[in-house]
Each structure stands twice: as C-alpha cells, then as structure tokens.
Amino acid sequence: MKLGLSSWTYSWNIGVPGYPQPTCPMTAMDLLKKAHELGAQVLQIADNLPLEALSLEELDALAAQAKAWNISIEAGTRGVQPHKMTPFLDVAVRLGATFVRTLLHDADGCPTVEEARQNLLALIPELEKRGLTLGVENHDFFHTLQIKELIESLNTDCIGVCLDPVNNFAQGESTLEVLTNLGALTVNFHCKDYTIHRKSSNLGFDVEGTPTGEGMLDVPRCRKFLHEDMSCVIELWTPWQGDADATAQVEADWAQRSVQYLKTVL
C-alpha cells in the first residue's frame, strides 16, 4: 500500500465553511509541499479544495512539481452526473492522475441507487478512454450492501469503492461490517481513526477523530480485507479547538503523527 495525504487531512488548514478561517489557508501547492515534507507517496486533492477552480497554469505547475517529487496525484470531487464528471476527468488527466474519487451525492442532492447506476454506466467509456479508475466513496446515505450491489452490477474494473471505515456509522454499520461488505471491491482506502466515548450525562455517545494509530481503528486488521495495490490516504476528524489557527496547528500535528504511525505498519 502507498501512504497518502489528502485535502481532508488538512480540512481546518484549508478552511471549513461556517467556521472562522485560518490566517494562511493552505493552497493545493502548499498541500503538495506538505506531502513531500512528510514523505507521502500519494496526495488526494478532493472537493474541499476544488481542482476545477484552478487555472490551467496552476494545474500544470502542480502536475510538474508532483512529478519532480515522485508524488502521485489523486483527484477528488462529488457527484456522478456525466455532464459534470466528464470535464472533471479531463482535469484529472491534466494532473497526471490515474485515480478519481467521488461521492454519489453533491450539492444538487442525492440520486437513487438506480439513478447512480445509470450515471456510472454512462461514465465507463469516458473512464476507459482516459485510463482512469473511479472510486465511489461509501457515505451516510447508503448502506454498504447497496453500494456493494451497485458496484458489482456495473461489471467493470474501472469503477470500485473508495472505502471509508467510519462514514457508515450513520447507517448503524460498524467498521467491520463496512470492511466485510466492501473490502474486496475497494480500490482506495481512507484511513480515518476515531474514538467513541460516552457523554458526560451518560445519555449517548460522541464520535471524534484521533491521529491514525491512536484510536479504535485497527489498521493492520483493515489491511487483511484490502488488496495491496492501492493508496492508504489519511483523513482526520480533528475537533474544533475554539480558534482557527489553534485547530489548524493541532491538525498539522495529528497529520505528522499519523504519517509516522502508518510508516510502521504499511
């Protein structure tokens, strides 16, 4: 497995909508520099740092620097509508990416499983033409068995699962269920560690992120469900610290600790 960082590793450093912004928000090039600094082999730039907002010159500069540092770029977006996805696939190709991550839903809403299937079927020739693999991330809106049936129904090697072990808590599914149902179809792994603790009132539980290797996610166990030929991309759910820059600093520290841990187990 290749160790990767993501724009979702550094959400607070980039800026989270609805919260105070950091003094110096990270750009895509800043993110690439951080990946190089920490020794990551892969950088996944997703929808919280939209690649389609970059100029052609910025995309070319990013691609050239990534190549110079031997870092593979992975492109991330939301949605599966062909009229939106096809131009984004061209952005991915321009960056030299061979992998694209997406979600079934976007700002326009969430499709039904059948609508998603028809959209993905229409994308297959576009992916094949460009030599791209698409990873559909499991998320809150669908049970993993629905995702499994959807991906298997496409009968193609160019679309698989981008597996997040924590997102389906909202569907009442454990990490083990997610890995069992989707592991064999996975083409990209979001390594997101977490902890669950009871509220001070004893009435309910809170789920929070932790640095990778310091929470409840058993990474070596996860690997047993996954193919080796994919990237393991760190994502963080760093809690808000009451101040934008303080939160960004904690997040940066967590990212470094996460990389250090993964280097011992990958």
What are these regions (language model features)?
Residues 1-97, 249, 256-266:
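N-terminal pre-domain/capping segments
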Residues 3-10, 43-45, 71-77, 100-102, ...:
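Hydrophobic faces of well-ordered beta-strands that scaffold small-molecule active sites
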Residues 5, 35, 66, 92, ...:
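Conserved, mostly hydrophobic/aromatic
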Residues 9-11, 47-49, 79-81, 104-108, ...:
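Active-site-proximal loop/turn and secondary-structure-junction residues that shape catalytic pockets
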Residues 24-26, 56-61, 86, 90, ...:
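Charged helix-capping and loop-helix junction motifs
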Residues 58-59, 65-161, 170:
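Active-site acidic/histidine proton-transfer and metal-coordination neighborhood
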Residues 122-216:
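Acidic/histidine-rich catalytic cores of soluble enzymes
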Residues 213-227:
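A short, acidic, amphipathic alpha-helical segment used as a generic capping/interface helix at domain edges
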